[in-house]
């Protein structure tokens, strides 16, 4: 079942056409990678999907409903969550409080005083932390976390509204190889655990680390110059001569398959 259907998405900034009519679909239970050189249009696409900017032309349908014109908050409340290259967490709060704040937002109660929020759905927050292996550190300040654990916390926050679509913007940036594999293996496990449920999870992620892309993506989209130049299985994309030329300027193997496949 298609969770997300993007059709003929276009966007220009001044005289620069950042996106030139890209179209793709994302299915429930799928991990879809979006790759491309800097300036290919990946960030522009993500920013349109979660309502940060509006396309000049095209449609974005989520669960059969248009997302056009919705704010990031409205998009989030529809069931679209996003993690960022630079984690969006509150360093002075505990891990549990970070997740509780997301739960408040999911229940349309951000107006509540923080004194109330410290007790609001604490048990539920602990369970989201358990999903990412951080429940034992629930009362630790976020500032005390190692970087890889901050990314896990951000994942727990993103899951707080039980999304059907998770957008992950370079989730493993700045991580060591083992940390990258651990985070993506966790993400894949979360997706698979939700597959049998009515509210299954689909993931769209951008990534520069090709071992992550080829190790964890079910399908891959390749952008270059604002156009979708290739899509398919990791192996199909790896063997695509146009993709090889875009990345390496010649007809040679693109990348070796990564770990975690």
Regions found by a protein language model. Give the residues of each.
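Glycine-rich phosphate-binding loops of nucleotide-dependent enzymes
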Residues: 2-261
